[in-house]
Amino acid sequence: MNITKSYVVIFFLVMLTNSLSNSDILVSSVIETSKYDVCFIPCTRRYEDRECNDDCLAKDFNDGGCVDGRCCCKY
């Protein structure tokens, strides 16, 4: 019984540690895209910064570019 209890405690400690260690990665993308107003279409090799910027300007935004794999526009 005590061995099972120990395994359960260790399992939960590993899960807690893993969830806390991944939080820094998620926060960095939120901070980077917070400078932009709208993010949409995914950026690819054929749809890069220039195409993204052109689309943003066509939609009456002041600027645009690829951020974290998405086309983001700002006023």
From Swiss-Prot:
Intracellular or extracellular location(s): Secreted
Any Gene Ontology biological process: defense response to fungus
Residues making up the signal peptide according to the UniProt record: 1-19
InterPro entries given in the database record: Defensin-like_dom
Keyword hit for Signal: yes
Keyword annotations of the record: Antimicrobial, Disulfide bond, Fungicide, Plant defense, Secreted, Signal
A GO cellular component annotation in the UniProt record: plasmodesma
Keyword rRNA-binding on entry: no
Disulfide bonds: C39-C73, C43-C66, C52-C71, C56-C72
Primary location: secreted
Family designation: Belongs to the DEFL family.
Name of protein: Defensin-like protein 59
Species name: Arabidopsis thaliana (Mouse-ear cress)
